[in-house]
A protein has these predicted regions:
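An alpha-helical, amphipathic repeat domain used for nucleic-acid recognition
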Residues: 1-332
Length: 332
């Protein structure tokens, strides 16, 4: 009935609705025509509704001027003029909104002084002055924020102490002093972090004892002692790691027995015994590997003769018989 729809209109207008937003809300219960008629005759001042909507919105979440304007336009369907009137007249102190936004951000994510300013400017659409005011006045202990950020990072990935400091400085924008404090107070056992790094690495990529050890020191900031502890205690079967490495190599490039052995020892850091185990057990058909290598050469080099291709395959470590098989299959 009209009485029912008018009563519902009055209830909605207490919260602040735009014309289009109110029509949409009423259409869940009434027909479109009934909703339009009720809204056309409700006598609402849509500018004041925008003010009310802005005030109600600010009661449960902090917004910048531009952020609130966008919210009123895009999600509550006020016109440009109504949304502008709403934010201009809602009585908000945008500096204090920046403080509230900073506090809200810190409730669910740890961050640094400088990064929080950037987030308030970029995502919250506060002016830089408002963002700086908000961050300066939010009461955060930035050293403790660094500790929390370190602990959050450790939930998802293994880190060395130096790697953690670098992450906190480079990504989170903490000062070096704050990052050092966090690394010392986040509760990490760096030996166990090293072990975790090795274990996680070997889950998706085979590696040798020496390769892992050196990479941990050269690229990931672990000490020699931590790296040694990790590779000694990770439980890896290095023969099987060599075998996996050999099989992965053969998936993307053809190799001869001798070339594969050389790759495993000279480039991947496996021992001679581990490399020998791998090439003996990788299941490769060396004739077919020679054929694949020959086909690669034929694809990229024109006018190859039989003798030239034989020479190239033998240079790659294939036996005379394997090279002969390959060129015979190609009809040369």
């Amino acid at each position: 009935s009209m009485a029912d729809i008018n009563e519902m209109v009055e209830l909605y207008l207490e919260d602040g609705y735009s014309y289009d937003g109110l029509v949409e809300a009423l259409e869940y219960t009434f027909t479109h025509d009934e909703a339009v008629e009720a809204v056309d005759n409700c006598g609402a001042d849509w500018n004041e509704q925008a003010v009310l909507a802005a005030q109600n919105t600010l009661e449960y979440t902090a917004y910048s001027y531009d952020g609130l304007y966008y919210m009123l336009m895009e999600y509550q369907y006020f016109t440009d003029e109504q949304a502008r009137y709403g934010v201009d007249n809602c009585g908000a102190d945008w500096n204090e909104q920046a403080v509230a936004a900073a506090l809200q951000q810190l409730e669910f994510s740890s961050t640094s002084h400088d990064k929080l300013i950037e987030e308030l400017v970029e995502y919250g659409e506060f002016t830089r002055e408002q963002a700086e005011y908000g961050v300066e006045n939010c009461g955060a202990d930035w050293s403790e924020q660094a500790v929390k950020a370190a602990q959050e990072s450790l939930e998802y990935s293994a880190y060395s102490r130096d790697g953690m400091v670098e992450e906190l400085v480079e990504y989170y924008m903490f000062t070096d002093e704050q990052a050092q404090y966090a690394a010392d107070n986040c509760g990490a056992d760096w030996d166990e972090q090293a072990l975790r790094y090795v274990t996680e690495t070997l889950e998706y990529s085979p590696d040798s004892y020496d390769g892992l050890y050196q990479a941990m020191i050269d690229y990931y900031g672990y000490t020699a002692e931590q790296a040694q502890y990790a590779v000694d205690n990770c439980g890896a079967d290095w023969n099987e790691q060599a075998l996996k490495a050999a099989q992965e190599t053969l998936e993307y490039t053809p190799c001869s027995y001798s070339d594969l052995y050389t790759n495993l020892t000279e480039y991947d850091g496996f021992t001679e015994e581990q490399a020998q185990y791998a090439v003996d057990n990788c299941g490769a058909d060396w004739n077919e590997q020679a054929l694949l290598a020959a086909q690669d050469y034929m694809e990229y080099l024109d006018d190859l003769t039989r003798d030239t291709l034989l020479t190239m395959l033998e240079f790659d470590g294939f036996t005379d018989e394997q090279a002969e098989y390959a060129v015979d299959q190609l009809g040369l």
